[in-house]
Amino acid sequence: MTTILKHLPVGQRIGIAFSGGLDTSAALLWMRQKGAVPYAYTANLGQPDEEDYDAIPRRAMEYGAENARLIDCRKQLVAEGIAAIQCGAFHNTTGGLTYFNTTPLGRAVTGTMLVAAMKEDGVNIWGDGSTYKGNDIERFYRYGLLTNAELQIYKPWLDTDFIDELGGRHEMSEFMIACGFDYKMSVEKAYSTDSNMLGATHEAKDLEYLHSSVKIVNPIMGVKFWDESVKIPAEEVTVRFEQGHPVALNGKTFSDDVEMMLEANRIGGRHGLGMSDQIENRIIEAKSRGIYEAPGMALLHIAYERLLTGIHNEDTIEQYHAHGRQLGRLLYQGRWFDSQALMLRDSLQRWVASQITGEVTLELRRGNDYSILNTVSENLTYKPERLTMEKGDSVFSPDDRIGQLTMRNLDITDTREKLFGYAKTGLLSSSAASGVPQVENLENKGQ
């Protein structure tokens, strides 16, 4: 069976991921007029720029949908976001600033929950607004087929008939008006924005050019911290984790993770925390550029990693970072539910996150400028008395350290012999001016 349909399957049910924007509105109306039976599915991901979710399915019905459903994905989205924090599943960083994979997390939830809803309605053909150059077309493809093995894919934006008739936003707007819908195009921005309650992505258009900076972006989850006229007073915030799970902010305990994330967004957003400018590698190996917001994710991530470094040993922390980067890349590629990702998630949540219990107090200032004021945990292996510089009882003596250093002579001797071997073969210069250790020929020392 052909998985991807190049032309409209007339007379068949087609599920469309319906945002209510111009593109999906025109596509739904066009499919109905051409003889398909469209079903509209809208994901409530807690998008910060969406004012009225309930109105979206109503508009879909007006445009010809056979049925329209609003699927609440917020609880699952936050659960996956917390899992990503527990695992450090982030692989794109620039200058210490992290992209929190908020769009890939949203696609993992949308791609599974919407297709599951379609399957309930007997809809086995799915369309969405992703383009052939981006990451989402592959993410949705993978998650859709994982959820429904019988799924077929139809995308109007890959159908030459649709493109010939309605190839641009102006043509789509004229089409809607001609069909009796007073649909006016929204004012064109200098970039495109996609968001969910974990974060926002700003990309394309002017932002494709690296001389266009973050300063052209109007944040939807934070503030213009780079604008000196924007007053941002410093603020102390306390974050508490229990067994790797964020449970309290500023002493207020949350039983609802969605409400906790919304409050974390409000706190971090007041300062512009978690905003970053990234050049990344798309799934197809081409580079793209995005400016990201994720105030709540950033706040939780900072507190989580502070506890992590005080609780776990060096090798565990190293594995957390290495496996987290690997898992972040799998998430980015649309493989969040693949076996290799599940294996990494299980080990990180079981052996790392389970011990993260405690409280971190931060002072937030402008943007990503913050200070850690206090760290408290019953699981801390950081114990200042072990290494205090003050006189008193110690867990080891000067003689103990002399013995430990003496044992280092073995590997120091081995390393020195290797350096001499490298110099002998020309890989290293024996001159101290080269910036490498000066290698002395011990064999000829007595001559």
From Swiss-Prot:
Establish whether keyword Aminoacyl-tRNA synthetase is in the entry: no
What residues bind L-citrulline, as annotated? Answer: 99, 135, 139, 192, 201, 203, 280
Q: Which InterPro entries match?
A: Arg_succ_synth_type2_subfam, Arginosuc_syn_C, Arginosuc_syn_N, Arginosuc_synth, Arginosuc_synth_CS, Arginosuc_synth_type_1_subfam, AS_cat/multimer_dom_body, AS_multimer_C_tail
What Gene Ontology cellular-component terms does the record carry?
A: cytoplasm
What would be one Pfam family of this protein?
Arginosuc_syn_C
The organism's superkingdom is given as Bacteria
| Recorded family membership | Belongs to the argininosuccinate synthase family. Type 2 subfamily.
PANTHER family registered for this protein in UniProt: ARGININOSUCCINATE SYNTHASE
Specify the protein name.
Argininosuccinate synthase
Q: Which organism is it from?
A: Escherichia coli O9:H4 (strain HS)
User: Which lineage is the organism of this entry classified under, starting from the top rank?
Assistant: Bacteria, Pseudomonadati, Pseudomonadota, Gammaproteobacteria, Enterobacterales
